[in-house]
Amino acid sequence: MARPLSPLDFLLAVLLVAAVVLLLARPHGHRAQAVLADPARTPGVLNPDVTQANIRSTICRHGWTATIRPPVSYTNDLKRRQMRLYGETGSLSDYQEDHLISLELGGNPTDPRNLWPEPYPRAAEMDRTENELNAQVCSGQLTLAQAQQREDTIKHTQG
């Protein structure tokens, strides 16, 4: 049978557990909750080259977004500026400069009104949502406008 803990051993165990809890609960450079896209700063802007009539040659064509994606030098500079505007103080690497209306759904690639700093891991979760909405548009389950509206609502209300 195990011997009972001495008062000192008990105190050390409690302190160790408290330290672990504090370390795990500590935010890592950004708020614990999602950064919502501010409708005033980031209302979302569409790419005029993408329409319902041409989705087969644009957003539904494999690899198309790579042809319009802005360079990292542009998005990192914008991310730095927008993080200050959004009051975010974490490391740049903790955020993705995300498109409110994604490239996969016909969002403008470079307009700052379509981009904002979204923290990880939420940014990665939203990438999956963007891909799912794109698949629904390309399969005819949703119109382009319906998918864009859903994405706008999600990012302005859920992060």
Where are these regions (language model features)?
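Nuclease and nuclease-like effector domains acting on nucleic acids or nucleotide cofactors
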Residues: 1-95, 105-159
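Short active-site segment of divalent metal-dependent hydrolases/proteases
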Residues: 102
